[in-house]
Amino acid sequence: MNAPALEARGLKRNFGALIATDDVSFVIAPGARQALIGPNGAGKTTLINLLTGVIKPTTGQVFLQGRDVTFLSSSARVRMGLSRTFQINQLFPDLTPAESLGLAISERNGSGADFWRVAGGRPAIVAEIEELLTRFGLEAELDQPTRKLAYGKQRLLEIALALATRPRVLLLDEPAAGVPEEERQDILAALAALPADVAILLIEHDMDLVFNFASRISVLVAGRLLTEGAPEEIAADERVRAVYLGEDAHG
């Protein structure tokens, strides 16, 4: 039996008297398409920071592909196959998309310090850059400084950068946040085209995006998991409708 791609066991995180994450346990299977939703203040960001090693739990454990990574650093988890995007872009504004991807790939290969010399001299790196640019529809912008890209394109670049680490698990923190309505279909198309063997956890407020993407949804309220299930189960759950979706959401 294969180990889960990512597992939380009894995660709890206190900030003084505030319990931000309260005994959260869940499993993400290899290749899963899962979403985490919840109202503002539910503790989603704290949970993601616990999973990625930004902060450590008060109690509980995190397992990545069967290995206990609870007290490993974020960078160690990236090397082991856990990557993420951020609600607010973490990009290099003066680099082009091609340069940014080349740097990410070189870092993954352990040659980041020699990026400018190595990237252009290795056909495999150049080919991978081109493949990622094409996958995310960034070919036309490959030589533009990132700061000049449309915001939707910047969000796509951040997903491409996360994928450049070759993760086994990818956490996407509100990839559609701030993206104009007319560009959101590009985000959904990019998510749908992500490699099938990479487990995805999508944290998102856009319910159309969530229900079109995820095959399983976890609902977090006040730091605790309220429920988990298939999209149709979540949409029909009166508790979820009361605290998050609203009475008219999704039928």
What are the residue ranges of the model-derived segments?
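Glycine-rich phosphate-binding loops of nucleotide-dependent enzymes
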Residues: 2-251
